[in-house]
Amino acid sequence: MTRDMKISLTFPKQAYAVFFALVLSLVRGVAYSNEIGIALEAPMAILAFTFCADTYTQEIVSRRSEIWRLCSMKKRMHCIYRRIAVQELFLLTVAAVSYGLFFLFQNPITYIMENGSESEICRFFVYMAAMAVTLGFWGILSNLISCLFRNMWVGIGGCLVLWTITNSILGDRIFGAWNLFSYSFRNLEDSSDFSWIYGKVVCICIGILAMAALPAIIRKRG
């Protein structure tokens, strides 16, 4: 596990993730606290698919792939899954810290509903749940495409195309509540509307399929 952390969480990657969150919290303006999730989801998705694209391809770049192939498939997959988990936990921590940075730097107006002060806490936990799915989906998808083409830049580019389509007014009109970014396009005025969860279910289902397909891709392309 320690070795996987050193490989997948290098200092440069940690540094640019933290810097990204810091800059975002300074330049992305929000007026109310319930807008923070919208301000963070799409940019954090970009961070996720750039951060995780080299989860496996770094073995190819560093020319360790020949040694890697000597390991059993089970061991190789466990290693990849651990690296993905480590990166996703780090990104989720960055997402949580980013939420706090918006309060620190921009001091948005707290959007209080009938639940009083507890509504802000509930809103944060809902945000974290949505971000866990978003980060997981884009990180897994980026790694899958990178493994398929043995190139991290193809993984990043493929995800960027999908990101551009779904994170748009056109994407919202076409997919509605089933959009990958349904959390960002949700109705802020209706806190009881959880139809955006459909989009997150889509992310989870695609993520599971991607993880299931990964061993076959590694076996053929690894």
Summary of predicted features, one role per range:
Residues 30-32, 122, 147-222:
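Terminal transmembrane helical anchor/hairpin motif
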Residues 49, 78, 162-163:
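Small-residue-rich segments of transmembrane alpha-helices in multi-pass membrane proteins
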Residues 60, 64, 101, 105-113, ...:
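Membrane-interfacial segments
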